[in-house]
């Protein structure tokens, strides 16, 4: 697989923009002291900057495509961490399952109620 200098530059710019958004998000998280992770805030920063046209999608696409292509490798450290702390996971299995089911039910009921309000009660 051959890479041209233009492709390499596109990857550098793309990763630079992604990491800049991550850094800004981490800074906002640290500055505000919120419990929302900096990576999530950074993703929102990147989304908003693309939505308002500050950053073009074509600038971010090469790096994002590469990350998505090899995403499975990014789950290896998480899997190893889960195996290392499996006893803690089992000890907290009931709260984890309850919060997953409860959260899903809350989202389902809220979304159903909201859609009925927006679309009108046609059923």
From Swiss-Prot:
Sorted alphabetically, which Pfam families does this protein's record hold?
A: LrgA
Q: Localized where?
A: Cell inner membrane
Its main localization is: membrane
Lipid bilayer topology: Multi-pass membrane protein
What does the UniProt keyword field contain?
Cell inner membrane, Cell membrane, Membrane, Transmembrane, Transmembrane helix
Q: List the disulfide bonds.
A: none
Looking at the keywords, is Cell membrane present?
A: yes
User: Which Gene Ontology cellular-component terms appear in the entry?
Assistant: plasma membrane
Highest taxon above the source species: Bacteria
Looking up InterPro entries in the UniProt record yields: LrgA/CidA, Uncharacterised_UPF0299
Transmembrane stretches in the record are 8-28, 35-55, 71-91, 94-114
Protein family according to the UniProt entry? Belongs to the UPF0299 family.
* HAMAP family to which the protein is assigned, alphabetical: UPF0299
Q: State the name under which the record lists this protein.
A: UPF0299 membrane protein VV1471
Which species is listed as the source?
Vibrio vulnificus (strain YJ016)
**What phylogenetic lineage does the species belong to?**
Bacteria, Pseudomonadati, Pseudomonadota, Gammaproteobacteria, Vibrionales
């Amino acid at each position: 697989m051959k890479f041209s200098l233009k492709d390499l530059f596109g990857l550098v710019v793309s990763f630079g923009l992604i990491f800049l958004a991550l850094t800004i998000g981490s800074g906002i998280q640290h500055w505000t002291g919120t419990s929302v992770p900096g990576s999530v805030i950074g993703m929102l920063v990147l989304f908003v900057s693309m939505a308002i046209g500050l950053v073009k999608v074509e600038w971010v696409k090469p790096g994002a495509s590469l990350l998505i292509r090899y995403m499975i490798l990014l789950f290896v450290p998480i899997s190893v961490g889960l195996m290392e702390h499996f006893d803690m996971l089992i000890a907290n299995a009931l709260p984890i399952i309850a919060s997953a089911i409860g959260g899903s039910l809350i989202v389902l009921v809220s979304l159903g109620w909201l859609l009925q309000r927006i679309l009108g009660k046609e059923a």
